[in-house]
Amino acid sequence: MAHAWGYGPADGPESWAESFPIANGPRQSPIDIVPTQAQHDPSLKHLKLKYDPATTKSILNNGHSFQVDFVDDDNSSTLAGGPITGIYRLRQFHFHWGSSDDKGSEHTIAGTKFPCELHLVHWNTKYPNFGEAASKPDGLAVVGVFLKIGAANPRLQKVLDALDDIKSKGRQTTFANFDPKTLLPASLDYWTYEGSLTTPPLLESVTWIVLKEPISVSPAQMAKFRSLLFSSEGETPCCMVDNYRPPQPLKGRKVRASFK
């Protein structure tokens, strides 16, 4: 039986170190990004994202978030450039959000929280598969995008419309022909640092690429995220909210900026 973990008082982030001691490791995520303390690095390259909508596979409520999974057996949907070397394949994207619009993101910017954060998870093709890559220091690259309250975002709607079919934990349905590039902001300026998965097993294998510019989401769209359940069918319903880990100590790491 895998270690049970969640976001409640008993099984939440404060308790994860009991089963996953790396929770107190040297390169944990998320962090608070302080723009005035981030160093502009002119050697950082532009991000090259090449996503093929045909690789979209399914959408799943995993009991912690919901994720959209992609076929990753060839280089159809990839990330290159930026701070990384080589080609990383898109595996899935998922979100973290709060119970209200004043919190929910994992990364914060000078202490400012956003209501939601999108994570696009990629793995380094120098390793044979995702599982292998996830344990390597340069195995994963995750692009983080903040969602900020504003106008309704039509590009989010296809994803949100699918949530009715995966309300409870363990539910999965086909999800086809979606281009994740449509969820990215106009500017791909980013901060980058070496970190970890933000959920157990909290492996320290992630090059984080956090975009400076948020995308918009309306209050009604945020309410749709909160209609999901942590609980399985037949259990007492428990709303999926506040599924974020708070910022972790920087422990001497450098945060670099791709922009001045």
From Swiss-Prot:
> What Gene3D superfamilies does UniProt report for this protein, alphabetically?
Alpha carbonic anhydrase
**Is RNA-binding among this UniProt entry's keywords?**
no
Asked whether the UniProt record includes Repressor among its keywords, one would answer no
User: Which reaction(s) are listed as its catalytic activity?
Assistant: hydrogencarbonate + H(+) = CO2 + H2O
Q: Which residues bind substrate?
A: T198, T199
- Active-site residues are H64, Y127
Gene Ontology terms: cellular component: cytoplasm
Region Disordered: start-end pairs = 1-31
According to UniProt, the name of this protein is Carbonic anhydrase
Species source reads Danio rerio (Zebrafish)
